[in-house]
Protein backbone atom coordinates (compact mmCIF):
# COMPACT_ATOMS: atom_id res chain seq x y z
CA UNK A 1 0.00 0.00 0.00
CA UNK A 2 1.51 3.34 -1.04
CA UNK A 3 2.34 5.74 1.76
CA UNK A 4 0.94 9.25 1.51
CA UNK A 5 1.92 12.42 3.35
CA UNK A 6 -1.25 12.02 5.43
CA UNK A 7 -0.51 8.39 6.36
CA UNK A 8 2.61 6.31 7.00
CA UNK A 9 3.66 3.06 8.66
CA UNK A 10 5.68 2.97 11.87
CA UNK A 11 9.16 1.53 11.51
CA UNK A 12 10.14 -1.44 13.75
CA UNK A 13 6.57 -2.68 14.27
CA UNK A 14 5.85 -5.58 16.65
CA UNK A 15 6.62 -9.06 15.30
CA UNK A 16 3.18 -10.45 16.21
CA UNK A 17 -0.39 -9.17 16.60
CA UNK A 18 -0.87 -5.71 18.15
CA UNK A 19 -3.20 -5.78 21.16
CA UNK A 20 -3.41 -2.04 21.90
CA UNK A 21 -2.26 1.38 20.71
CA UNK A 22 -2.51 4.36 23.11
CA UNK A 23 -1.34 7.97 22.73
CA UNK A 24 0.33 9.90 25.54
CA UNK A 25 -1.94 12.05 27.75
CA UNK A 26 -1.03 15.40 26.20
CA UNK A 27 0.73 14.46 23.04
CA UNK A 28 0.26 13.42 19.47
CA UNK A 29 3.94 12.44 19.48
CA UNK A 30 4.25 9.45 21.81
CA UNK A 31 2.45 6.18 21.15
CA UNK A 32 2.45 3.10 23.39
CA UNK A 33 1.98 -0.26 21.64
CA UNK A 34 1.44 -3.63 23.34
CA UNK A 35 1.72 -6.86 21.42
CA UNK A 36 1.40 -10.63 21.34
CA UNK A 37 5.15 -10.63 20.61
CA UNK A 38 5.70 -10.12 24.39
CA UNK A 39 6.75 -6.45 24.19
CA UNK A 40 5.55 -3.00 25.19
CA UNK A 41 7.00 -0.39 22.82
CA UNK A 42 7.16 3.37 22.96
CA UNK A 43 7.26 5.20 19.61
CA UNK A 44 7.93 8.78 18.66
CA UNK A 45 5.49 9.10 15.77
CA UNK A 46 6.78 12.50 14.65
CA UNK A 47 10.30 11.23 13.94
CA UNK A 48 8.96 7.69 13.25
CA UNK A 49 11.28 5.84 15.56
CA UNK A 50 10.93 3.32 18.36
CA UNK A 51 12.29 4.96 21.49
CA UNK A 52 12.02 2.02 23.90
CA UNK A 53 11.01 -1.62 23.94
CA UNK A 54 10.29 -3.54 27.16
CA UNK A 55 10.47 -7.33 26.65
CA UNK A 56 7.93 -9.33 28.72
CA UNK A 57 7.55 -12.98 29.76
CA UNK A 58 4.26 -13.47 27.89
CA UNK A 59 1.98 -11.79 25.32
CA UNK A 60 0.78 -8.34 26.45
CA UNK A 61 -2.97 -7.71 26.04
CA UNK A 62 -3.26 -4.04 27.02
CA UNK A 63 -1.31 -0.98 28.12
CA UNK A 64 -1.87 2.64 29.13
CA UNK A 65 0.03 5.81 29.97
CA UNK A 66 -0.15 7.08 33.55
CA UNK A 67 1.59 10.36 32.70
CA UNK A 68 4.09 11.39 30.05
CA UNK A 69 6.93 9.34 31.58
CA UNK A 70 5.21 6.27 33.05
CA UNK A 71 3.10 3.47 31.62
CA UNK A 72 1.37 0.27 32.75
CA UNK A 73 0.71 -3.05 31.03
CA UNK A 74 -0.82 -6.47 31.63
CA UNK A 75 -1.28 -9.72 29.76
CA UNK A 76 -1.10 -13.49 29.78
CA UNK A 77 1.45 -13.61 32.65
CA UNK A 78 -1.29 -12.11 34.94
CA UNK A 79 1.12 -9.42 36.27
CA UNK A 80 0.49 -5.67 36.19
CA UNK A 81 3.79 -3.92 35.40
CA UNK A 82 4.83 -0.28 35.38
CA UNK A 83 7.58 1.30 33.26
CA UNK A 84 9.54 4.49 33.77
CA UNK A 85 10.72 5.88 30.43
CA UNK A 86 13.29 8.22 31.98
CA UNK A 87 15.15 5.50 33.87
CA UNK A 88 14.19 2.66 31.48
CA UNK A 89 13.16 0.70 34.60
CA UNK A 90 10.32 -1.74 34.97
CA UNK A 91 8.63 -3.12 38.10
CA UNK A 92 5.82 -5.52 38.95
CA UNK A 93 2.92 -3.90 40.81
CA UNK A 94 0.66 -6.88 41.53
CA UNK A 95 -1.25 -9.83 40.13
CA UNK A 96 -4.57 -11.22 38.98
CA UNK A 97 -5.46 -14.93 39.10
CA UNK A 98 -5.88 -15.12 35.32
CA UNK A 99 -4.65 -13.06 32.32
CA UNK A 100 -5.14 -9.29 32.48
CA UNK A 101 -7.27 -8.20 29.50
CA UNK A 102 -7.69 -4.44 30.14
CA UNK A 103 -5.49 -1.71 31.61
CA UNK A 104 -6.77 1.90 31.85
CA UNK A 105 -5.81 5.03 33.76
CA UNK A 106 -8.60 7.14 35.29
CA UNK A 107 -7.29 10.70 35.78
CA UNK A 108 -10.43 11.87 37.66
CA UNK A 109 -9.92 9.29 40.42
CA UNK A 110 -6.12 8.92 39.95
CA UNK A 111 -6.29 5.12 39.76
CA UNK A 112 -5.10 2.46 37.36
CA UNK A 113 -7.91 0.01 36.55
CA UNK A 114 -7.31 -3.58 35.41
CA UNK A 115 -9.90 -6.07 34.19
CA UNK A 116 -9.12 -9.78 34.04
CA UNK A 117 -10.39 -13.14 32.84
CA UNK A 118 -10.50 -14.02 36.57
CA UNK A 119 -13.84 -12.11 36.64
CA UNK A 120 -12.51 -9.22 38.72
CA UNK A 121 -11.63 -5.57 38.30
CA UNK A 122 -8.76 -4.29 40.44
CA UNK A 123 -7.87 -0.69 41.26
CA UNK A 124 -4.24 0.32 41.79
CA UNK A 125 -2.87 3.45 43.45
CA UNK A 126 -0.16 4.78 41.11
CA UNK A 127 1.48 6.83 43.87
CA UNK A 128 2.83 3.80 45.73
CA UNK A 129 1.99 1.67 43.32
CA UNK A 130 -0.15 -0.90 45.16
CA UNK A 131 -3.53 -2.65 45.03
CA UNK A 132 -6.41 -0.44 46.18
CA UNK A 133 -9.24 -2.97 45.97
CA UNK A 134 -10.60 -6.00 44.12
CA UNK A 135 -14.17 -6.06 42.79
CA UNK A 136 -16.01 -9.16 41.54
CA UNK A 137 -17.68 -9.03 38.11
CA UNK A 138 -20.33 -11.48 36.83
CA UNK A 139 -17.95 -13.10 34.32
CA UNK A 140 -14.63 -12.71 32.47
CA UNK A 141 -13.84 -9.05 31.74
CA UNK A 142 -13.51 -8.48 27.97
CA UNK A 143 -13.39 -4.69 27.82
CA UNK A 144 -13.70 -1.63 30.03
CA UNK A 145 -13.78 2.13 29.67
CA UNK A 146 -13.31 5.03 32.07
CA UNK A 147 -15.97 7.75 31.84
CA UNK A 148 -15.10 10.64 34.17
CA UNK A 149 -15.17 9.01 37.60
CA UNK A 150 -17.31 6.14 36.36
CA UNK A 151 -16.17 2.81 35.04
CA UNK A 152 -18.05 0.82 32.37
CA UNK A 153 -17.20 -2.88 32.30
CA UNK A 154 -18.19 -5.35 29.57
CA UNK A 155 -17.99 -9.04 30.48
CA UNK A 156 -18.70 -12.40 28.91
CA UNK A 157 -22.38 -13.23 28.79
CA UNK A 158 -23.11 -9.75 27.33
CA UNK A 159 -23.22 -8.13 30.77
CA UNK A 160 -22.48 -4.40 31.17
CA UNK A 161 -21.76 -2.91 34.61
CA UNK A 162 -21.46 0.77 35.50
CA UNK A 163 -19.40 1.47 38.64
CA UNK A 164 -18.65 4.70 40.51
CA UNK A 165 -14.88 4.78 41.07
CA UNK A 166 -15.30 6.99 44.17
CA UNK A 167 -17.61 4.44 45.77
CA UNK A 168 -17.03 0.86 44.62
CA UNK A 169 -19.19 -0.59 47.42
CA UNK A 170 -21.97 -1.47 45.00
CA UNK A 171 -22.69 -1.58 41.26
CA UNK A 172 -24.36 1.65 40.10
CA UNK A 173 -26.10 0.06 37.09
CA UNK A 174 -26.39 -3.51 35.78
CA UNK A 175 -27.26 -3.79 32.12
CA UNK A 176 -27.38 -6.31 29.37
CA UNK A 177 -25.85 -5.46 26.00
CA UNK A 178 -28.49 -4.44 23.48
CA UNK A 179 -26.49 -6.42 20.89
CA UNK A 180 -27.28 -10.14 20.57
CA UNK A 181 -23.68 -11.30 20.23
CA UNK A 182 -20.50 -11.22 22.33
CA UNK A 183 -19.22 -7.78 23.35
CA UNK A 184 -15.87 -6.89 21.78
CA UNK A 185 -15.15 -3.25 22.76
CA UNK A 186 -16.61 -0.42 24.88
CA UNK A 187 -15.46 3.22 24.77
CA UNK A 188 -17.09 6.19 26.49
CA UNK A 189 -18.06 9.54 24.99
CA UNK A 190 -15.61 12.34 25.89
CA UNK A 191 -18.65 14.38 27.04
CA UNK A 192 -19.27 11.56 29.58
CA UNK A 193 -22.95 11.11 28.60
CA UNK A 194 -22.69 7.55 27.39
CA UNK A 195 -20.69 4.90 25.62
CA UNK A 196 -20.39 3.00 22.37
CA UNK A 197 -20.26 -0.79 22.37
CA UNK A 198 -19.35 -3.17 19.55
CA UNK A 199 -19.92 -6.88 19.04
CA UNK A 200 -18.34 -9.75 17.12
CA UNK A 201 -21.29 -9.60 14.71
CA UNK A 202 -20.84 -6.36 12.73
CA UNK A 203 -22.91 -4.12 14.97
CA UNK A 204 -22.39 -1.06 17.14
CA UNK A 205 -24.69 0.31 19.87
CA UNK A 206 -24.79 3.90 21.14
CA UNK A 207 -25.89 3.92 24.78
CA UNK A 208 -26.59 6.64 27.37
CA UNK A 209 -25.75 6.48 31.08
CA UNK A 210 -28.67 8.58 32.38
CA UNK A 211 -31.30 5.93 33.27
CA UNK A 212 -34.29 8.28 32.79
CA UNK A 213 -36.76 7.00 30.15
CA UNK A 214 -36.51 10.12 27.95
CA UNK A 215 -32.72 9.80 27.68
CA UNK A 216 -32.89 6.02 27.20
CA UNK A 217 -35.18 6.62 24.21
CA UNK A 218 -32.18 8.06 22.35
CA UNK A 219 -30.16 4.84 22.35
CA UNK A 220 -29.85 2.92 19.11
CA UNK A 221 -27.76 0.29 17.32
CA UNK A 222 -26.62 -0.05 13.71
CA UNK A 223 -24.98 -2.55 11.36
CA UNK A 224 -21.48 -1.94 10.03
CA UNK A 225 -18.34 -3.76 8.86
CA UNK A 226 -20.30 -6.01 6.51
CA UNK A 227 -19.28 -6.73 2.94
CA UNK A 228 -21.42 -8.05 0.08
CA UNK A 229 -19.51 -10.65 -1.93
CA UNK A 230 -21.19 -12.54 -4.80
CA UNK A 231 -24.63 -11.77 -3.40
CA UNK A 232 -23.70 -13.01 0.08
CA UNK A 233 -23.19 -10.74 3.07
CA UNK A 234 -19.99 -11.35 5.03
CA UNK A 235 -20.20 -10.08 8.61
CA UNK A 236 -17.08 -9.10 10.55
CA UNK A 237 -16.29 -8.45 14.23
CA UNK A 238 -15.95 -4.77 15.22
CA UNK A 239 -12.73 -4.97 17.24
CA UNK A 240 -11.88 -1.36 18.00
CA UNK A 241 -13.54 1.95 18.85
CA UNK A 242 -11.76 5.28 19.44
CA UNK A 243 -13.25 8.67 20.27
CA UNK A 244 -12.26 12.06 18.93
CA UNK A 245 -11.93 14.14 22.12
CA UNK A 246 -12.80 17.43 20.46
CA UNK A 247 -15.75 16.51 18.23
CA UNK A 248 -17.27 13.58 20.19
CA UNK A 249 -17.23 11.55 16.96
CA UNK A 250 -15.74 8.05 16.90
CA UNK A 251 -13.85 5.62 14.70
CA UNK A 252 -14.59 1.90 14.41
CA UNK A 253 -12.24 -0.77 13.06
CA UNK A 254 -13.28 -4.23 11.97
CA UNK A 255 -11.90 -7.55 10.81
CA UNK A 256 -12.84 -6.43 7.28
CA UNK A 257 -9.73 -4.19 7.40
CA UNK A 258 -11.90 -1.05 7.25
CA UNK A 259 -11.93 2.08 9.46
CA UNK A 260 -15.11 4.19 9.57
CA UNK A 261 -15.67 7.55 11.27
CA UNK A 262 -19.15 8.10 12.76
CA UNK A 263 -21.18 11.00 14.13
CA UNK A 264 -23.03 9.13 16.86
CA UNK A 265 -25.39 11.95 17.80
CA UNK A 266 -26.64 12.48 14.25
CA UNK A 267 -26.48 8.79 13.28
CA UNK A 268 -24.27 9.41 10.26
CA UNK A 269 -21.10 7.95 8.81
CA UNK A 270 -18.70 10.81 8.12
CA UNK A 271 -16.12 8.88 6.11
CA UNK A 272 -14.49 5.56 5.36
CA UNK A 273 -10.75 5.10 4.82
CA UNK A 274 -9.17 2.75 2.29
CA UNK A 275 -8.91 -0.97 3.12
CA UNK A 276 -5.96 -1.98 5.33
CA UNK A 277 -3.91 -5.17 4.76
CA UNK A 278 -5.63 -7.22 7.51
CA UNK A 279 -8.01 -6.89 10.48
CA UNK A 280 -8.07 -3.67 12.51
CA UNK A 281 -7.06 -4.69 16.04
CA UNK A 282 -6.87 -1.33 17.84
CA UNK A 283 -7.43 2.39 17.21
CA UNK A 284 -6.41 5.54 19.12
CA UNK A 285 -6.86 9.25 18.48
CA UNK A 286 -4.29 11.65 19.91
CA UNK A 287 -5.57 13.99 22.63
CA UNK A 288 -6.07 16.90 20.19
CA UNK A 289 -7.66 14.62 17.58
CA UNK A 290 -5.14 15.45 14.87
CA UNK A 291 -3.71 11.93 14.53
CA UNK A 292 -5.25 8.46 14.43
CA UNK A 293 -3.14 5.35 15.14
CA UNK A 294 -4.42 2.24 13.34
CA UNK A 295 -3.15 -1.25 14.22
CA UNK A 296 -3.62 -3.77 11.42
CA UNK A 297 -2.82 -7.45 12.03
CA UNK A 298 -4.12 -10.93 11.39
CA UNK A 299 -6.51 -11.90 14.21
CA UNK A 300 -7.12 -15.58 13.45
CA UNK A 301 -10.84 -15.05 12.83
CA UNK A 302 -10.61 -16.25 9.25
CA UNK A 303 -9.99 -19.98 8.75
CA UNK A 304 -6.89 -19.53 6.63
CA UNK A 305 -4.10 -17.07 7.39
CA UNK A 306 -3.24 -14.94 4.33
CA UNK A 307 -0.02 -15.78 2.45
CA UNK A 308 1.67 -12.78 4.03
CA UNK A 309 0.61 -11.73 7.51
CA UNK A 310 1.84 -8.24 8.03
CA UNK A 311 1.78 -6.58 11.44
CA UNK A 312 1.62 -2.83 10.98
CA UNK A 313 0.75 0.35 12.84
CA UNK A 314 -0.34 3.18 10.55
CA UNK A 315 -0.22 6.80 11.65
CA UNK A 316 -2.82 8.91 9.87
CA UNK A 317 -3.13 12.68 10.09
CA UNK A 318 -6.85 13.40 10.13
CA UNK A 319 -8.67 16.65 9.42
CA UNK A 320 -11.98 18.23 10.45
CA UNK A 321 -13.58 17.21 7.18
CA UNK A 322 -13.14 13.55 8.21
CA UNK A 323 -13.93 13.87 11.92
CA UNK A 324 -16.22 16.88 12.52
CA UNK A 325 -20.02 16.53 12.48
CA UNK A 326 -21.59 18.19 9.43
CA UNK A 327 -23.63 21.10 10.74
Predicted regions and their residues:
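WD40-repeat beta-propeller superdomains and closely related acidic/aromatic-rich repeat-like regions
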Residues: 1-327
Amino acid sequence: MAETPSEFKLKNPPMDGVSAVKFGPNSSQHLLVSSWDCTVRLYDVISNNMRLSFPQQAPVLDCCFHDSVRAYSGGLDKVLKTFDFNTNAERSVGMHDAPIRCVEFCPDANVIVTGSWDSTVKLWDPRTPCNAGTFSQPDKVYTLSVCGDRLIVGTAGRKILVWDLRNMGYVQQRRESSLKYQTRCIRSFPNKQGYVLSSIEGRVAVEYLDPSPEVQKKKYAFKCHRVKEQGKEKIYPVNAIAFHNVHNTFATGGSDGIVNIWDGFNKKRLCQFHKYPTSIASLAFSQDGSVLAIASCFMYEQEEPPEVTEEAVFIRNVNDQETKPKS
